[in-house]
Amino acid sequence: MNKKRIVFVTGTRADFGKLSGLIKILDNSKYEKLIFITGMHMLTQYGLTKLEVQKFADAQHVEFVNQRPDDMLDTILSKTIMGFSDYILEVKPDLVVYHGDRVESLAAALACTTNYVNSVHVEGGELSGTIDEVFRHSITKLSDYHLVCCSDARNRIIQLGENPENIINIGSPELDFHSKDSGVSL
């Protein structure tokens, strides 16, 4: 049986916290898991958090430096589109999963759309009142499937014109992590 190849895109510790639970629940006998590590993960000034992502031993990792400390968002976006587009043309994923409203997710969504690769946007439909909201809604429109955290977000995505059958309310992905015993007693 051929395994389905799924790429997860992560640019920050925060989005990886949301994606890690989804990565863990995938059956290794059915899915080949790949993690595209970029963004703030790669910068020492943000703690070089790529080291945390690399602890996922049952997933393949690729690292892509998409920015220097003083790069503007448009520069980061264009570098990430080019790097991620090259990557998906090489690995030919069946599906790409990204989270939220960051420039790395926008770049992945654009690369998937222009290369006809199916994609999933996690936590679209949220409101922030910042530039990130524009990114989030753009990412939603570029995505094929949507995993949302509440009915309000689902309704916003439907108002954007997306097919209700492609929107699944899964709740907030990191709640599963927080519901487990951390080993720390109070």
Language-model features and meaning:
Residues 111-125:
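Active-site proximal beta-strand in glycosyltransferases
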Residues 32-76, 83:
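Conserved nucleotide-sugar phosphate-binding/catalytic loop shared by glycosyltransferases and other
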Residues 25, 108-112, 138-139:
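Hydrophobic/aromatic ligand-binding patch that stacks against planar heteroaromatic rings
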Residues 86-103:
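Short N-terminal targeting/anchoring amphipathic segment
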Residues 1-41:
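N-terminal subdomain of nucleotide-sugar transferases
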Residues 9, 42-44, 142-186:
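A nucleotide-sugar donor-handling region in carbohydrate enzymes
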Residues 128-144:
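A conserved, positively charged/aromatic
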Residues 15-19, 102-109, 154:
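Short glycine/serine/threonine-rich phosphate/pyrophosphate-binding segments
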